């Protein structure tokens, strides 16, 4: 297998040292990621932090940084947090994602990885991001992005928002902004082989061309809404109430019904071997149809038409 890979055969690897993290019942903490866990509301609040320094000047500097290189450090932490919550906290059905940081710096890191895409480590980091974003796509949790100040949701980190079921952006006179980079146009494909923008605007190639022309530009809430890049843009007066209602609404539904609904909506477009296995099929055939919520004595099918209230188990797969 190694003989078929690109690049020299005498490369020197980097050490993926154990992640520095603090784990408790209510939080996960990493260098560039914090996750607060609220069992009462069934919410995990993700806060991802952008870089504080500019990217290295060349691939040699990248190799020297190794696991401390911001995109690699962040994606390792995100991967770990996703797996931890999926495995150990099936009671937490809502994941809310926020980002802080300098959007310009984030786009510079995107440009660095693409400029040096022939370097093996740069390529592996991009492939790592592809895998982790796909892992988020197939996670049976309700995903919501909150853009409430700053321009941290830029380039690669805007892919996190595009992976979410809903994107709420605060309409606050341009202090909140998003921006696109080349990473958003096919470099980080989904399981269906399309970019998340292509999946969002399925069949509307003209919209993708339009968005490509404005990559790198800061887009306000009003502009993002007009382009279809966000779900809702509440103002400061309505923000807290709209977000609270959206989360409470998701929490009130059957977790299994949401797993099916969200899988259906996330995997539009071409059916591939990957989506057949990990998209709708896993959600419906391997989970929903066998669960007590559907076929148990207090489930929706036996009680259909009886007038009795269904008792849903809110645990997620």
Segments and roles (model prediction):
Residues 1-160, 167-173, 212-226, 237, ...:
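C-terminal alpha-helix plus adjacent terminal tail
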Residues 154-211:
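CoA-thioester-processing core
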Residues 202, 235-236:
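Helix-capping/helix-break motifs at membrane-protein junctions
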């Amino acid at each position: 297998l190694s003989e078929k890979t690109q690049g020299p055969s005498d490369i020197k690897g980097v050490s993926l040292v154990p992640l520095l993290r603090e784990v408790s019942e209510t939080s996960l903490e990493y260098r560039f990621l914090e996750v607060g866990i609220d069992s009462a509301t069934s919410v995990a609040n993700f806060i991802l932090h952008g870089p504080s320094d500019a990217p290295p000047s060349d691939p040699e500097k990248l190799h020297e940084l190794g696991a401390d290189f911001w995109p690699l450090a962040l994606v390792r932490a995100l991967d770990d947090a996703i797996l931890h919550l999926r495995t150990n906290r099936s009671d937490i059905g809502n994941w809310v994602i926020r980002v802080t940081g300098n959007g310009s710096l984030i786009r510079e890191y995107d440009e660095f990885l693409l400029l040096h895409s022939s370097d093996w480590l740069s390529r592996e980091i991009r492939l790592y991001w592809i895998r982790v974003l796909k892992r988020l796509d197939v996670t049976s949790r309700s995903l919501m992005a909150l853009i409430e100040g700053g321009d941290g949701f830029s380039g690669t980190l805007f892919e996190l928002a595009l992976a979410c079921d809903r994107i709420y952006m605060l309409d606050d006179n341009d202090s909140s902004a998003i921006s696109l980079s080349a990473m958003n146009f096919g470099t980080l494909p989904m399981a269906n082989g399309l970019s998340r923008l292509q999946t969002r605007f399925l069949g509307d190639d003209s919209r993708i061309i339009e968005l490509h022309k404005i990559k790198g530009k800061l887009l306000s809430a009003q502009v993002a809404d007009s382009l279809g890049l966000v779900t809702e843009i509440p103002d400061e007066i309505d923000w807290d109430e709209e977000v609270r209602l959206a989360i409470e609404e998701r929490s009130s539904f059957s977790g299994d019904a949401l797993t099916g609904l969200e899988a259906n909506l996330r995997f539009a477009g071409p059916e591939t071997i990957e989506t057949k296995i990990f998209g709708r099929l896993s959600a419906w055939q391997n989970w929903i149809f066998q669960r007590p919520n559907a076929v148990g004595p207090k489930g929706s099918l036996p009680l259909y038409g009886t007038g009795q209230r269904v008792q849903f188990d809110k645990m997620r797969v």
